Design a protein with these regions (language model features):
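Internal catalytic or translocation cores that form aromatic/hydrophobic pockets or channels
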Residues: 63
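Short active-site loop at a secondary-structure junction
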Residues: 83
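Exported/periplasmic ABC-transporter solute-binding proteins
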Residues: 1-44, 49, 53-60, 68-69, ...
């Protein structure tokens, strides 16, 4: 008597709603995930403030990725399924210039301050749009006493991609956003992270949205994304991965 064949798992179609800082890690990994599992993924990226607004407006997803405090709050409020939160890693705020221009000195707090003051224009994410790096930078400028001077020549952007675009096009002399949004881009070069005394590592996490229609596939995606085998990919794209495995 022949035993019945195991049912074939049908491919899932995952929807991921994510903060932009993780964008290039995800888009680098997604083709390999689809090749290995057959599952398809649709991404929607924005600032964490934009992600939160989409959720308030009733948008749904299978996976949500954002700053670690925001994901923890979503888990506490029931937006994310209890126990599904996973740390992804952290990235630093950095400075970029066009690929064909000299590198300014930001190795010290004073060097960083003078670089911003001397720059013709500075692009960064709009804090009012919920851009994490922009919120941090504006607070730092206020502490340094140069918020007004830099603000007069600021180009406020909707996300890190626009920051990079402004710099690569020559509209902004200097750009500031997360290194994970700078390092993958060829048209600009990373000057580096802000000097240690004023640096703020931003941690990111993921979780499965309560009511996801594909919780098993979502869990599989997060597990494969954070596996030790992916560590070098995270590092090469400006992220320090969390210590999974």
């Amino acid at each position: 008597m022949t035993s019945a064949a195991s049912p074939v798992r049908s491919a899932a179609h995952l929807k991921v709603l994510s903060a932009g800082a993780v964008k290039y890690v995800l888009t680098d990994f997604a083709p390999r995930f689809t090749r290995d599992t057959g599952d398809q993924i649709d991404f929607t990226f924005g600032t964490i403030g934009g992600v939160q607004k989409r959720l308030r407006d009733g948008e749904t997803a299978d996976i949500i990725m954002g700053t670690a405090p925001a994901i923890s709050q979503m888990e506490q409020s029931g937006v994310i399924a209890a126990g599904s939160r996973v740390d992804l890693g952290r990235t630093l705020t950095g400075i970029c210039v066009r690929a064909d221009t000299p590198m300014p000195d930001i190795s010290t707090p004073d060097g960083f301050k003078q670089t911003l003051l001397k720059a013709r224009s500075v692009a960064y994410t709009n804090p009012q749009a919920g851009g994490t790096s922009g919120i941090f930078l504006v607070g730092l400028l206020e502490r340094l006493g140069i918020a007004e001077a830099v603000g007069k020549k600021a180009l406020l952007c909707i996300n890190g991609d626009e920051v990079v675009d402004k710099v690569s096009a020559g509209d902004a002399e200097i750009g500031s956003t997360f290194l994970s949004e700078i390092v993958p881009m060829k048209a600009v070069k990373a000057v580096g992270a802000l000097p240690p005394p004023m640096q703020n590592a931003t941690a990111y996490a993921a979780g499965i949205m309560t009511g996801s229609s594909n919780p098993e596939a979502a869990e599989r995606f997060i597990a494969m994304l954070t596996a030790p085998a992916q560590r070098n990919a995270w590092l090469s794209l400006g992220f320090e991965p969390a210590g999974h495995g």
